């Protein structure tokens, strides 16, 4: 009877060993006119590593020679078994050689692996700072939700651009007068590619991209990855999942529906907590069509990739008045009104969003693990037989062929003469066109590519293939 109280007391004592951000930095994360640099943040990560809920991992050196930190957070019991949970995550993601029964058994044993990063675009300072606050709360809180998250999730909290945070924070904080501090950094915040570090995750030219890709695609293969960015569209607080169409047509449908499900959990949590201003789908410009970034490349590894773009700056700002955004709709069900906005509000929103994702992963742990196996198995099966991906140009070909045939036969275009039930639709086309055009053998998906050595971009092709091999 005394065991549970003693364990709880021990957990509280463990949490008390970790200093709060204010105790360590001298200010709260999110205070106006205050930023930490990476040297300070990394030193704080080492303080957090004193907790038995954590393991601090150096995932490699940056382009400027800094150590890139990843803090793994879970329950003390899970921390002792990280190798096993990593092995389960890899086996389910690879899917090869597993039966459904074996996959379900592994899914029941494993833990949801969730990646949360921050700081990739260093001038988007909410990202790196929400990471610090989230780490602290996960390491020190003992409420029921946090303990359930720690029990069911292995959380990979990763700094995406240490060099950039060092540069940007030092530049902003160089002014003694807080009112003179500005985010007008005069040079790139990644040594070679600056903002385009988020265009490097299919080629991995930069060391940071290589470090991150190894953890994502080789070591851990998380079921969910969450990439924090800025800025939110004018008249909103943030844009998040689900995203506007089109998505890439080759995705497994489970990618799309899982993004919808996690996005709903994120939006719902903010609404429960009285945090308005979340916009989705047509409310922003973000989609899943382009696939070379930190959030989008993982889709091809069957991970649920999440992106939020939030407002916020250590220098207070104002939420813009965009009249059309004040009317609730499916994209923005809970609009935000114009107001002054403080850095801490963005930190609080970000922590809430992280908790929404982690709570979802904890609640649906075994399903997430099984789903990534199922997507992997679907991909293997798809590669073993002929498969067609339908693109708009093929749909246009059907319409063109049908119109041509109708004209040639001088048929009445107002009638459906296919003998197939159309339920009043005027765009119904006889099914024979599906086989004749959409299933044309010429349009089959490729199962492999032959690259002749004399083609002009052969070195680029070799580089790309090596990048694929490196990333698993």
Feature-to-residue mapping (PLM):
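Second-shell loop/turn segments in exported
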Residues: 28-34, 117-124, 198-202, 252-253, ...
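Surface-exposed patches in mature extracellular/periplasmic domains of secreted proteins
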Residues: 53-60, 144-151, 278-283, 367-371
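Surface-exposed loop and adjacent secondary-structure segments within mature catalytic domains
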Residues: 18, 60-62, 68-75, 81-91, ...
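Hard-cation-handling environments
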Residues: 272-472
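Acidic/histidine-rich, surface-exposed loop or edge segments in extracytoplasmic proteins
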Residues: 18-33, 115-118, 192-196, 246, ...
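Cleavable N-terminal signal peptides
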Residues: 3, 13-16, 199
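N-terminal hydrophobic targeting/anchoring segments and the immediately downstream early-domain regions
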Residues: 16-56, 60-63, 67
């Amino acid at each position: 009877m005394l065991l549970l109280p003693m364990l709880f007391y021990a957990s509280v004592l463990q949490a008390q060993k970790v200093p709060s951000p204010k105790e360590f930095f001298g200010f709260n994360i999110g205070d106006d006119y205050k930023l930490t640099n990476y040297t300070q943040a990394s030193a704080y990560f080492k303080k957090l590593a004193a907790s038995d809920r954590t393991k601090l991992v150096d995932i490699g050196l940056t382009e400027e020679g800094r150590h890139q930190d990843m803090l793994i957070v879970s329950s003390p019991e899970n921390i002792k078994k990280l190798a096993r949970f990593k092995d389960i995550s890899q086996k389910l993601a690879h899917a090869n050689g597993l039966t459904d029964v074996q996959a379900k058994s592994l899914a029941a044993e494993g833990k949801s692996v969730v990646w949360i990063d921050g700081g990739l675009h260093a001038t988007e300072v909410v990202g790196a700072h929400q990471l610090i606050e989230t780490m602290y709360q996960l390491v020190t809180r003992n409420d029921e939700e946090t303990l359930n998250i720690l029990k069911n999730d292995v959380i990979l909290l990763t700094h995406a651009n240490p060099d950039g945070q060092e540069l940007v924070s030092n530049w902003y904080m160089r002014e003694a007068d807080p009112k003179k501090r500005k985010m007008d950094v005069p040079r790139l915040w990644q040594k070679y590619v600056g903002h385009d570090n988020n265009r490097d995750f299919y080629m991995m030219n930069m060391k940071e991209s290589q470090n991150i890709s190894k953890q994502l695609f080789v070591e851990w293969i998380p079921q969910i990855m969450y990439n924090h960015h800025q800025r939110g569209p004018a008249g909103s607080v943030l844009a998040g999942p689900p995203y506007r169409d089109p998505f890439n047509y080759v995705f497994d449908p489970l990618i799309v529906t899982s993004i919808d499900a996690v996005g709903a959990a994120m939006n719902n949590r903010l609404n429960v907590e009285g945090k308005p201003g979340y916009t989705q789908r047509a409310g922003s410009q973000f989609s899943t069509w382009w696939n070379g970034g930190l959030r989008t490349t993982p889709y091809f590894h069957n991970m649920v990739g999440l992106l939020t773009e939030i407002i916020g700056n250590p220098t207070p700002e104002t939420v813009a008045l965009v009249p059309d955004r004040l009317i609730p709709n499916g994209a923005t069900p809970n609009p935000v009104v114009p107001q002054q906005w403080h850095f801490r509000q963005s930190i609080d929103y970000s922590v809430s969003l992280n908790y929404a994702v982690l709570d979802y992963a904890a609640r649906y742990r075994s399903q997430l693990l099984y789903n990534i196996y199922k997507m992997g198995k679907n991909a293997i099966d798809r590669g073993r037989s002929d498969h067609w991906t339908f693109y708009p140009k093929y749909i246009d070909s059907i319409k063109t062929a049908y119109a041509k045939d109708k004209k040639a036969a001088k048929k009445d275009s107002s009638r459906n003469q296919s003998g197939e039930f159309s339920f009043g639709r005027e765009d119904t086309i006889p099914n024979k066109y599906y086989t004749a055009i959409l299933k044309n053998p010429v349009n089959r998906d490729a199962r492999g590519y032959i690259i002749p050595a004399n083609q002009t971009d052969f070195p680029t092709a070799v580089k790309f293939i090596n990048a694929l091999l490196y990333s698993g």
